[in-house]
């Protein structure tokens, strides 16, 4: 009978862990069935409710002509445009933020080279405009406006229209030319001039009489002197001769002097340089469309608010930083702990310590309760807003840390500068590696902060409720409180909004707590009672067995013999 009584008490204790009939209020946070994995400082895989992708991987298949002004070189590169090659007349007076050079651009005039090609290309691109100022040059006793069959314009022999090919006069004279131009303006001037390299000595004397010729161009701070390199070269457009083009910048107040006895390709004027303009050049086959974007790459325009992109390392304009990662996710919600599918609303209710609540859609944090009036769920907007306020602006702050006009253009070097090109590539690769690492670290820091903030707000809400209830309720250890007094919906609401008065319910709660705890058995007493029950049961069983043996012996039913 004692064993049966003890077993009943144990069953009663086990059932007391379920709903006892007292009001219960639980605290929890929002959850979704499938969250998003993000990286933090301490964990590579943390599931959060919501996250935002920071790396743009999509681009438009076209270049946007707005708001940046684009000029399409079409069949002309920017140097041919400055020289005035046939087919480049559409570039006269052109103005741009980005000059689009096409891979299909071709030379259409006398074959030439530019010893310092990339520097000239960069100066022209940065200038942002072909603003050519024609000048009068008084050349002495030479023939001007030379033409070539390699340079057709409207099927007629012509030449670069920004340059003047000087040859000997009809009287076979090419006297020394010495001409000075003073820059009296308030801007720097760019002069482009050239030296012709005939293919034979005969061609040299036929054109210039003097052999060898010489060209010297000087300013107050520089001098370039070139002697023609006479010799046959591979035939290009019917010519085995070549022209080498040079350039000279004349600052305000400076002057330029042309001195030659032959082979000079003279300028017809100068280009006005704009020191305030910061334009650039992009080599791509992507067509120009009608879209709007501030960022261009060699693969197309990017229209995004994301701070990073992994589309192309060559980018121009207000562009996201290029990183090597294909994805970086910024946590914009709390840690996600999906609700167990088998758990009902109550009965096996649990708070935030065990799992989140998928039904909590009006806020990030909230309450569930059960009392005599039924059950209910409500969001806690104050703690939700406190968390949102700290998380909102994270993306903007991240963009501010990385948002600058970022121009990364492809650089080219002459073959003799291969070591410089290798070094430049190494520097660029190192910079990209550094940016990629910094981006990943920055996002991980922000994600760690987001999760810490949201966890902190949950703990603050729990502590606020615990301080309100005090001994009027018991912490169940799973985010729930069992309340030891009658608590209707208005009472529950006072707990939620922070107006709960502990003293009003104190006496009732103390009485109910003692009554309930009088029949509750703690886990320590359970073990003692189990051992006592087992011992008593064994003792009773042994006593009954001995009593039966004694009774049987007395009646002669059992005989015991002892042999020595």
Swiss-Prot record:
Annotated keywords: Clathrin- and caveolin-independent endocytosis of virus by host, Clathrin-mediated endocytosis of virus by host, Disulfide bond, Fusion of virus membrane with host endosomal membrane, Fusion of virus membrane with host membrane, Glycoprotein, Hemagglutinin, Host cell membrane, Host membrane, Host-virus interaction, Lipoprotein, Membrane, Palmitate, Signal, Transmembrane, Transmembrane helix, Viral attachment to host cell, Viral envelope protein, Viral penetration into host cytoplasm, Virion, Virus endocytosis by host, Virus entry into host cell
Residues linked to a glycan: 18, 34, 178, 310, 497
GO molecular function: host cell surface receptor binding
Free-text function comment from the UniProt entry: Binds to sialic acid-containing receptors on the cell surface, bringing about the attachment of the virus particle to the cell. This attachment induces virion internalization of about two third of the virus particles through clathrin-dependent endocytosis and about one third through a clathrin- and caveolin-independent pathway. Plays a major role in the determination of host range restriction and virulence. Class I viral fusion protein.
Pfam families attached to this UniProt entry: Hemagglutinin
Signal peptide: 1-16
Leftover remarks: Major glycoprotein, comprises over 80% of the envelope proteins present in virus particle.
Family designation: Belongs to the influenza viruses hemagglutinin family.
Extracellular side: 17-527
Site feature: Cleavage: 343-344
Main location: virion
Lipid-linked residues (S-palmitoyl cysteine): 553, 560, 563
Topological domain spans for side Cytoplasmic: 549-564
Cysteine disulfide partners in this protein: 26-480, 64-291, 76-88, 109-151, 295-319, 487-491
Gene Ontology CC, one term: virion membrane
GO biological process: clathrin-dependent endocytosis of virus by host cell; fusion of virus membrane with host endosome membrane; fusion of virus membrane with host plasma membrane; viral budding from plasma membrane; virion attachment to host cell
Assembly and binders: Homotrimer of disulfide-linked HA1-HA2.
Subcellular localization, as worded in the UniProt entry: Virion membrane; Host apical cell membrane
The species this protein was found in: Influenza A virus (strain A/Turkey/Minnesota/833/1980 H4N2)
Post-translational modification: Palmitoylated.
Membrane-crossing segments per the record: 528-548
Recorded topology in the membrane: Single-pass type I membrane protein
Protein name (record): Hemagglutinin
InterPro entries named among the record's database cross-references: Capsid_hemagglutn (IPR008980), Hemagglutn_HA1_a/b_dom_sf (IPR013828), Hemagglutn_influenz_A (IPR000149), Hemagglutn_influenz_A/B (IPR001364)
HAMAP family from the UniProt entry: INFV_HEMA (MF_04072)
